[in-house]
Regions:
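Conserved C-terminal beta-signal and adjacent last beta-strands/turns
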Residues: 70-82, 86-99, 156
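Membrane-embedded beta-barrel scaffold of Gram-negative outer-membrane proteins
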Residues: 11-15, 20-26, 31-38
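Membrane-embedded beta-strand positions of outer-membrane beta-barrel proteins
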Residues: 23-25, 92-94, 168
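Solvent-exposed loop segments that connect transmembrane elements
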Residues: 1, 37-67, 106-142
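Hydrophobic, lipid-facing positions within transmembrane beta-strands of outer-membrane proteins
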Residues: 6-10, 75-79, 148-156
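Short sequence motifs at beta-strands and strand-loop junctions characteristic
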Residues: 1-4, 69-73, 100, 134-135, ...
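Transmembrane beta-strands of outer-membrane beta-barrel pores
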Residues: 16, 27-31, 96-100, 172-174
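Repeated loop/turn-to-beta-strand initiation elements of outer-membrane beta-barrel proteins
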Residues: 18-21, 87-90, 163-166
Length: 175
């Protein structure tokens, strides 16, 4: 297994006289790769899901592994102004985040191309006019996700009496 990552953050605060400024930023970058032995459970697929699922018949003692290769990256920024007075307190700000994730997941079985499982999948594919190349990979999936969040927000708190105040706030965001 390899796991390399970097996570940073920075907070800047300052008094502007009329309001308190807070700026918060962060950055995250992680790359992971792991491999696990699948022999302990691949042999039992047929016993658990039954003979109707010949696509999982890897033989009596299959040896294999699974791998996951993944990369995550995100950046975030929030800027806030806060004012505190005798009767009125308020906050206004904005938020931005950009994140990306990509992973490849692969399961292998040694000799898969000569197994009943491969022959079954190849037969299904041939019926629909496709050819499945011989490989020890019996499962592959990949996903890439990108997300961008933006928001603005604000809040006002008005002190009406010593015992009563009126508070209103809101947030508008796009994902």
């Amino acid at each position: 297994r390899t796991d390399e990552w970097l996570q940073t953050s920075l907070v800047i605060e300052g008094d502007l006289g009329f309001a308190q400024l807070t700026v918060v930023g962060s950055y995250y970058d992680r790359e992971t790769f792991y491999q696990h032995d699948t022999q302990s459970y691949a042999a039992y697929f047929m016993y658990v899901i039954g003979a109707y699922y010949a696509t999982y018949d890897f033989g009596t003692d299959p040896m294999g592994a699974l791998t996951n290769d993944q990369k995550n990256e995100s950046k975030a920024l929030e800027v806030r102004l806060t004012g505190i007075g005798d009767r009125l307190s308020w906050t206004a700000g904005m938020f931005y985040m950009d994140s990306d994730e990509h992973w490849d997941f692969t399961s292998f079985v040694d000799g898969y191309a000569s197994s009943t499982a491969f022959a079954t999948w190849a037969g299904y594919a041939a019926y629909y006019g496709f050819t499945v190349p011989e490989s020890d990979t019996w499962w592959f999936s990949a996903q890439t996700t990108s997300r961008e969040d933006k928001a603005v927000f604000g809040e006002f708190d008005v002190k009406l009496t010593e015992q009563l105040s009126f508070l209103v706030g809101g947030r508008y965001y796009e994902v």
